[in-house]
Amino acid sequence: MAMQKIFAREILDSRGNPTVEVDLHTAKGRFRAAVPSGASTGIYEALELRDGDKSRYLGKGVLKAVEHINKTLGPALLEKKLSVVDQEKVDKFMIELDGTENKSKFGANAILGVSLAVCKAGAAEKGVPLYRHIADLAGNPELILPVPAFNVINGGSHAGNKLAMQEFMILPVGASSFREAMRIGAEVYHHLKGVIKAKYGKDATNVGDEGGFAPNILENNEALELLKTAIQAAGYPDKVVIGMDVAASEFYRNGKYDLDFKSPDDPARHISGEKLGELYKNFIKNYPVVSIEDPFDQDDWATWTSFLSGVNIQIVGDDLTVTNPKRIAQAVEKKACNCLLLKVNQIGSVTESIQACKLAQSNGWGVMVSHRSGETEDTFIADLVVGLCTGQIKTGAPCRSERLAKYNQLMRIEEALGDKAVFAGRKFRNPKAK
């Protein structure tokens, strides 16, 4: 089924920054997709095209990307008469038309916007739900509901507190269904709010970009202690484990790490990667930490490798791998991590996202699907995680509508699957294992 019309516009994301939205029309109707955007971005990500016109949106406008779709990509696709079911052909055509390594001609935000809309239209054309269409594109016969990783305490570049590490997450792995995982997550979240309010005052329960709390604490183990207390208070010590996203590239300074990077710089307090690794090992020993993302800088390969060989938990590459097949292959070869963080806008098309996921899985890695800190009401990644059977998703706290949009969509998908719904639970690292 051919595309009839492609139209892009500039909308605002959850942080009040412009982003790209695409409407694609076929005989089956209108299919709309919006592109997310990150705050802590890896230097190897595909290029997000911004206008740079300081008189509009502080230079963050996306009218150039929108124009690339409306004047170039859209007309070229309509002329080519590709079917919306042929995701790979459509994506390949756009990537070749762009012709750059990192999509800098049109912008990954332009190409991805069209790619996502095409995927939604393709599902409608086949008359199947989006998650089933994605599963077909990936060659997956089964469908799996993921364990949600709720980012409930925020630090790093996402928050105005002193906390260096960016995300402290709870994973209800002991739940029996996705819906139950949502309830457990929400209950722990509310208990956490009470614990923080009692200890630090009401203003400490204001929420960050992803709906988590950002109390003004400096010590990272204090955040873990708060989680432990809230999990106990909610009555789920046997069902909830902890994940972290350190985003260490944000505080890497001349070969060392600064755990107080939001204060005036003082090289005397910078620590080595090895020392930081010891700190993580203490966290693993003292708390139910099962997953650590970006524990070291995106180019500090040697430290990643030596750390991975000394722990048996999930070590996730995000800034390290940026959903890019070349970086993933490098990380596999160096044995740097054992899980990929999958962000569609880091690579810039649905096809390449699926390829990155399959490359990681074929090397025995786990895969965690992820939102960005600047999100929209678009729910594509909810269907994506079910279709790709990755078993885990992080899309913020159970708070703020742009986060709940994804979680609520996952509850609907579970409901639609009925008896056939399979929840990853404790097998979140390798949900396909029988």
Swiss-Prot record:
InterPro entries, alphabetized: Enolase (IPR000941), Enolase-like_C_sf (IPR036849), Enolase-like_N (IPR029017), Enolase_C (IPR020810), Enolase_CS (IPR020809), Enolase_N (IPR020811)
Pathway(s) served: Carbohydrate degradation; glycolysis; pyruvate from D-glyceraldehyde 3-phosphate: step 4/5
Enzyme superclass (EC): lyase
Modified residues (N-acetylalanine): 2
SUPFAM superfamilies listed in its UniProt record: Enolase C-terminal domain-like, Enolase N-terminal domain-like
Catalyzed reactions per annotation: (2R)-2-phosphoglycerate = phosphoenolpyruvate + H2O
Residue numbers of Phosphothreonine PTMs: 72, 205, 229
Family recorded in the similarity comment: Belongs to the enolase family.
PANTHER family in the record: BETA-ENOLASE (PTHR11902:SF5), ENOLASE (PTHR11902)
Protein's recorded name: Beta-enolase
Organism, as annotated: Bos taurus (Bovine)
Designated gene of the protein: ENO3
